[in-house]
Amino acid sequence: MKVIMTTKVDKASMNIMQKLIENFGFKETELKFDGNPVYKKDDMVILTTNDEMIYYDYLDREIEKQLSFKPEIIAFASRHSSKQKLPALTTHVTGNWGEAMYGGKDESFAIAIPSAMKLALLKMNELNDLGWTVCYEATHHGPSELEVPSFFIEIGSSEEEWVNDRAGEIIAETIVYVLDNYENSKFKVALGIGGGHYAPKQTKRALNSDLAFGHILPKYAQPVSRDVILKAINRFHEKVEAIYVDWKGSKGETRQLAKSLAQELGLEFIKD
């Protein structure tokens, strides 16, 4: 089963859920998760919780405990908040390059699924008739303690956008498309290094080439140790083939570390 995760405390999440039910034929079942109705269509279920999803470590175990199945993948339908209030449609994997400020554990990562995130980016970009930004975000916040692949897909960045009907429709359609197609998609998988939080160069590369990013280490989280980068590389569902560096958007020691790791691991080194 493929899981679409939502929460009652998030207006964007509820907007996306409503559009999934209205437009894509999800039907209420007799099952409950965290006390809320479970909706199902084919091999997909919508689950709803009552608190912020970023703190839901071990969600996969909880699903197994309550519903007796292990998810193949979890798509978290969520809001994105930023001070700039940039209208945006974003996707990213979760985890913490350093201290865990917002869920998850320190220096710990969820399992990235680059093919799903790339398909999400491409589909959001294709459907985006709002004129909003479509982008990756760097790896940040929780949950980090999940043993199945997952990704967040978000509407940003203020209440006005969270409740926007068209944004809800775009994300709902994107999620269904991604869950239907990610298993049959083959891209060149890369760890991304450098740039700001919205990973502009990685986003551009993913939209215009066969590169698909999983974990992305932004400049503001640098430097990190070799061990932390290796930890992130080991938390990809698909085999990492390249390390990509936004050269100007990275600190000197991180550039060199990325270069030597690529050599050591036999990965392609892409300098942009």
From Swiss-Prot:
<dbReference type="InterPro" id="IPR007508">
    <property type="entry name" value="DtdA"/>
</dbReference>
<keyword id="KW-0862">Zinc</keyword>
<protein>
    <recommendedName>
        <fullName>D-aminoacyl-tRNA deacylase</fullName>
        <ecNumber>3.1.1.96</ecNumber>
    </recommendedName>
</protein>
<dbReference type="GO" id="GO:0008270">
    <property type="term" value="F:zinc ion binding"/>
</dbReference>
<dbReference type="InterPro" id="IPR018033">
    <property type="entry name" value="Deacylase_DtdA_archaea"/>
</dbReference>
<comment type="subunit">
    <text>Monomer.</text>
</comment>
<keyword id="KW-0378">Hydrolase</keyword>
<dbReference type="GO" id="GO:0051500">
    <property type="term" value="F:D-tyrosyl-tRNA(Tyr) deacylase activity"/>
</dbReference>
<comment type="similarity">
    <text>Belongs to the DtdA deacylase family.</text>
</comment>
<dbReference type="Pfam" id="PF04414">
    <property type="entry name" value="tRNA_deacylase"/>
</dbReference>
<comment type="function">
    <text>D-aminoacyl-tRNA deacylase with broad substrate specificity. By recycling D-aminoacyl-tRNA to D-amino acids and free tRNA molecules, this enzyme counteracts the toxicity associated with the formation of D-aminoacyl-tRNA entities in vivo. Catalyzes the hydrolysis of D-tyrosyl-tRNA(Tyr) and D-aspartyl-tRNA(Asp).</text>
</comment>
<keyword id="KW-0479">Metal-binding</keyword>
<dbReference type="GO" id="GO:0019478">
    <property type="term" value="P:D-amino acid catabolic process"/>
</dbReference>
